[in-house]
C-alpha cells in the first residue's frame, strides 16, 4: 500500500506522536501496580500460581500542582506485539512504539481542602484479548473529569501483559465458547473486586499512590468495561456490594448477570443496531431493576470503544488510508467520541451516587 511508505517515514525514524490532552479540568497522574492475589490460584496458569493482576491507575490532580511528563503509550513488549498487528494492516511496525501521552508529575501534595477531596473510583475491564494499555487515552479522559480510573490487565486473557520488572504473560488462547466465556467473566469479575480491595488499601497510598491528592469515595465505586469487560462488570456487581453500578460498552452479556439482572444502576452504551444483532442486550435490559439507559452512539463500530479512533486520528493519515481503516474504527469524529463517552461516564457516576 502507498500509505505504508508514508507511515514508515512518520514513525519508522523514531518520530514521537503525542496524543492530544483531554478536555477535563484536572491534570492526570498515572501509576502502575502489580497486584498478587494470594487467596486465588489462577485457573489459566499452567503452573497453578497465584492470580497476578496488573493495573494502571489514573488519578486526577489540580493542574497548578503539576509538572508535565510524557510517557510511552505502550511498554516495549506490548508495543512490539501491537506493532506486528499494525504491520499486517500496512502500517509501520513501529506505530505503537511511537505514540506517547502527557501526564502529571505532582509537584507537591495539596494541603487543606485539596488533601481531603474524595473522587469516584472507576474500575475498567478491557475487551477480550485486549491490553489495558489500549484504553489509556480513554482512562486519562475519564480521570480528567475528576475520577480515579483503574485499568486492569487480565492474565492469560490479554494478548500480552508486560510487568514493570520486564516479565511477560502471553495469552492462554482461552476458547470462545459460551461456557468458557461465562467462566472467564467470573474470573474477570473477581479481578475487578480484587483491584478495588487493593486500591482501598492504606498501604498502597504509602507506596504506589504516594504523593497523590485526595482519596477514593467509597460510595462511588463503579465498574465499566468494553465488550467482555462490560459483561465482567455486570457479573462483578452481583457479588460485590461495594460497586454502586456499572456500564457495558458494546459487549454481549453473559450469565448469571443476563438471567438474574441487577438491582443497581447500569448503562448499555453501544454501536447502532447492537440490540438487534445481540439478543442479550434486550433480555438483560428488561431484567435491570435500577436506573438504566441504553445509549446508541452513531457512526461507531465495536472497535470504536477503544483508543483506536484517537490513535488513527493522531497519525494524520491520507484520506484513502483513513477510509480503509473505517470498518475497524467507525466514522465518528474521535474527539467528539472521547468527549461524549466522558460525559456519559460523568452522568452515570452521578446517577450511581444518588442511590
Language-model features: where?
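Fungal secretory targeting signals
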Residues: 1-16
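Short substrate-entry loop that stabilizes the transition state in hydrolases
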Residues: 99-162, 274-277
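C-terminal catalytic-base region of ester-bond hydrolases, centering on the histidine
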Residues: 48, 68, 287-355
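Active-site machinery of serine-nucleophile hydrolases
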Residues: 58, 62, 72-92, 133-174, ...
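The feature captures the conserved acid-bearing segment of alpha/beta-hydrolase catalytic domains
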Residues: 113-114, 244-305
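Alpha/beta-hydrolase active-site loop
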Residues: 156, 162-218
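Domain-level recognition of soluble alpha/beta enzyme cores
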Residues: 15-122, 324-334, 345-347, 354
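Primarily recognizes the serine-hydrolase "nucleophile elbow" in alpha/beta-hydrolase
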Residues: 195-261
